[in-house]
UniProtKB/Swiss-Prot annotation:
Protein name, UniProt field: Large ribosomal subunit protein uL4
Superkingdom of source: Bacteria
Gene3D superfamilies reported for this sequence: 3.40.1370.10
Any one GO BP annotation for this protein: translation
One GO term describing the cellular component: ribonucleoprotein complex
GO MF annotation, one: rRNA binding
UniProt function note: One of the primary rRNA binding proteins, this protein initially binds near the 5'-end of the 23S rRNA. It is important during the early stages of 50S assembly. It makes multiple contacts with different domains of the 23S rRNA in the assembled 50S subunit and ribosome.
Family, similarity comment: Belongs to the universal ribosomal protein uL4 family.
Keywords, alphabetical: Ribonucleoprotein, Ribosomal protein, RNA-binding, rRNA-binding
Subunit structure: Part of the 50S ribosomal subunit.
Keyword tRNA processing: no
Organism: Roseobacter denitrificans (strain ATCC 33942 / OCh 114) (Erythrobacter sp. (strain OCh 114))
Gene assigned in the entry: rplD
Entries under InterPro entries matching the protein: Ribosomal_uL4 (IPR002136), Ribosomal_uL4-like (IPR013005), Ribosomal_uL4_dom_sf (IPR023574)
Length: 205
């Protein structure tokens, strides 16, 4: 499939052939969902922790005698039934990450690219270059109508462009190896350079 290539100033710069296996799939929400869950679960710190009845700072002495008070039978003040007592089966420090095969992760990335293509939210640009001035780049981005965009460059990111883009709200740039399903789906517009297209095709073949 062919898609027009533009420059940062909006001028046309020819066209590019996109691989059907990467950009022409019928997007499946279940595949995208599984990959996004895998990404977000692996990113979760898992540092949540509450104290059990053996860890709270209370005496383990029985609070009153067993019989003869007319009240319910109780043991230590640290029991979960009391305010300030331990928590029964509360969260512990653990990893939320789970395994997902490399083949499935690649498939998810192909479906994410295809989803952007199908939605008309994919833009191919000739290259990313800048004089390092944030104001000039922000004006170009505004003229192109990119409000929340992710730019995928080639194997390495143009450092001058990255510096200029750093303070533009809603604009992010990643190298090809950093391209992932979550970041692609989170943005309204996916922008890929010609070098990025070639690198993605080499990575996902």
């Amino acid at each position: 499939m062919k898609l027009d290539v533009i420059k940062l100033d909006g001028a046309k710069a020819g066209s590019v052939d996109l691989d059907e296996a990467l950009f022409g799939l019928e997007p499946r929400a279940d595949i995208l969902h599984r990959v996004v869950r895998w990404q977000r679960n692996n990113a979760q710190a898992g540092t949540h922790k509450v104290k059990t009845r053996s860890e709270v700072n209370y005496s383990t002495k029985k609070i009153y005698r067993q019989k003869g008070t007319g009240g319910a039978r109780h043991g230590a003040r640290s029991a979960p039934i009391f305010r300030g007592g331990g928590v029964y089966k509360g969260p512990k420090v653990r990893s939320h990450g789970h395994e997902l095969t490399k083949k499935f992760r690649k498939l998810g990335l192909c479906h994410a690219l295809s989803a952007k293509m199908k939605a008309g939210e994919l833009v191919i640009i000739d290259e990313v270059s800048s004089d390092g001035k944030t104001a000039a780049l922000a004006k170009q981005v505004a003229n192109l109508g990119w409000k929340r965009a992710l730019i995928i460059d080639g194997a390495t990111v143009n450092e001058t462009f990255a510096q200029a883009a750093r303070n533009i709200d809603g604009l992010d740039i990643l190298p090809t190896m950093g391209a992932n399903v979550y970041d692609i789906l989170k943005r309204d517009t996916l922008v890929i350079t010609k070098a990025g297209v070639e690198a993605l095709e080499a990575r996902l073949k």
